[in-house]
């Protein structure tokens, strides 16, 4: 019996064919690295967000509970100072309460950005709302800072007397509330910058 031998001929691919073919599953190194970077930024965002909420809450509580009554009084007058005597401080309490509420409600969206760092929709929503909240916080803090300055120094041109020599505790508390509001506003600005950096990487 005759046995037929079969031989196989292997043809090497040319360099042009090799260049034209792309790998089916490219290594996802760059994608994983970008996701890890965005997740780290999102964690830092969450920390700043909680810190800003704490500062805004402290500013709201301190200003909203500020009241001082002097130990002496006359037959017709009792010398008392409260935050609601001034419309600017009332606006401050309302504005910072809104800022606090927003920051607390935005925490779940920040957690979503940690869990799914590649998704851009939560980050876009946060940067828009953060920008509006920065405007509200800075307007409340700036207006109240002007009143605090007048309370400490007065205005001789307008014949406004400084009241902090008499209402020392009142002035210390409102000053602390304004400082806390500015801290919250600065942290909100950092949050806007972080969101802008992450969106630029998309």
Curated annotation (Swiss-Prot):
<keyword id="KW-1133">Transmembrane helix</keyword>
<dbReference type="GO" id="GO:0071555">
    <property type="term" value="P:cell wall organization"/>
</dbReference>
<feature type="compositionally biased region" description="Polar residues">
    <location>
        <begin position="1"/>
        <end position="13"/>
    </location>
</feature>
<dbReference type="InterPro" id="IPR044173">
    <property type="entry name" value="CASPL"/>
</dbReference>
<feature type="topological domain" description="Cytoplasmic">
    <location>
        <begin position="112"/>
        <end position="130"/>
    </location>
</feature>
<dbReference type="Pfam" id="PF04535">
    <property type="entry name" value="CASP_dom"/>
</dbReference>
<dbReference type="InterPro" id="IPR006459">
    <property type="entry name" value="CASP/CASPL"/>
</dbReference>
<keyword id="KW-1003">Cell membrane</keyword>
<keyword id="KW-0961">Cell wall biogenesis/degradation</keyword>
<feature type="topological domain" description="Extracellular">
    <location>
        <begin position="64"/>
        <end position="90"/>
    </location>
</feature>
<comment type="similarity">
    <text>Belongs to the Casparian strip membrane proteins (CASP) family.</text>
</comment>
<comment type="function">
    <text>Regulates membrane-cell wall junctions and localized cell wall deposition. Required for establishment of the Casparian strip membrane domain (CSD) and the subsequent formation of Casparian strips, a cell wall modification of the root endodermis that determines an apoplastic barrier between the intraorganismal apoplasm and the extraorganismal apoplasm and prevents lateral diffusion.</text>
</comment>
<feature type="topological domain" description="Cytoplasmic">
    <location>
        <begin position="199"/>
        <end position="202"/>
    </location>
</feature>
<feature type="transmembrane region" description="Helical">
    <location>
        <begin position="178"/>
        <end position="198"/>
    </location>
</feature>
<protein>
    <recommendedName>
        <fullName>Casparian strip membrane protein 1</fullName>
    </recommendedName>
</protein>
<feature type="transmembrane region" description="Helical">
    <location>
        <begin position="131"/>
        <end position="151"/>
    </location>
</feature>
<feature type="topological domain" description="Extracellular">
    <location>
        <begin position="152"/>
        <end position="177"/>
    </location>
</feature>
<keyword id="KW-0812">Transmembrane</keyword>
<feature type="transmembrane region" description="Helical">
    <location>
        <begin position="43"/>
        <end position="63"/>
    </location>
</feature>
<feature type="topological domain" description="Cytoplasmic">
    <location>
        <begin position="1"/>
        <end position="42"/>
    </location>
</feature>
<dbReference type="GO" id="GO:0005886">
    <property type="term" value="C:plasma membrane"/>
</dbReference>
<feature type="region of interest" description="Disordered">
    <location>
        <begin position="1"/>
        <end position="30"/>
    </location>
</feature>
<comment type="subunit">
    <text>Homodimer and heterodimers.</text>
</comment>
<keyword id="KW-0472">Membrane</keyword>
<feature type="transmembrane region" description="Helical">
    <location>
        <begin position="91"/>
        <end position="111"/>
    </location>
</feature>
<dbReference type="InterPro" id="IPR006702">
    <property type="entry name" value="CASP_dom"/>
</dbReference>
